[in-house]
Regions:
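Amphipathic, Lys/Arg-enriched alpha-helical "gate/interface" segment within cytosolic domains
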Residues: 1-122
Length: 122
């Protein structure tokens, strides 16, 4: 299941988790495109449930999106909280190198929301 929701204020929430469906990878990549095209400033909460994986082609598309949208993300995203179950590995380090805005990897959605709420407004 993939969902991109605009919540109150400037918060965008991207959800990618079970139950997984055949079109999830395309929906996830489409959600990234929608985030990259957003004109208004925002904070992003990315909630990943389970251990769904992208195909090699999906990984490549995601990496190209990171490169293509870097300047726009720097200009409009004020912070990113990534919620991952279990051991996040090096996620915070990897994503923190992509952008200069604040990035955290949280164990729960509540922790991610608290991090975003503590960031200064745009």
């Amino acid at each position: 299941m993939v969902k991109l929701e605009a919540e109150g204020g400037d918060l965008l929430t991207l959800r990618f988790g079970p139950p997984y469906a055949p079109g999830d990878e395309d929906a996830y990549l489409g959600a990234l495109e929608a985030i990259g095209a957003r004109a208004a400033p925002f904070a992003l909460l990315a909630v990943f449930g389970g251990r769904g994986r992208l195909s090699p082609a999906g990984e490549r598309s995601q990496a190209l999106w990171f490169k293509r949208t870097r300047a726009g993300m720097e200009a409009r995203c004020r912070a990113l909280a990534i919620v991952r179950p279990g051991e996040p590995g090096r996620s915070a380090e990897v994503f923190g190198r992509l952008w200069s805005f604040p990035v955290t990897v949280a164990a729960s959605e509540a922790e991610g929301r608290a991090f975003l709420a503590a960031q200064p407004p745009p």
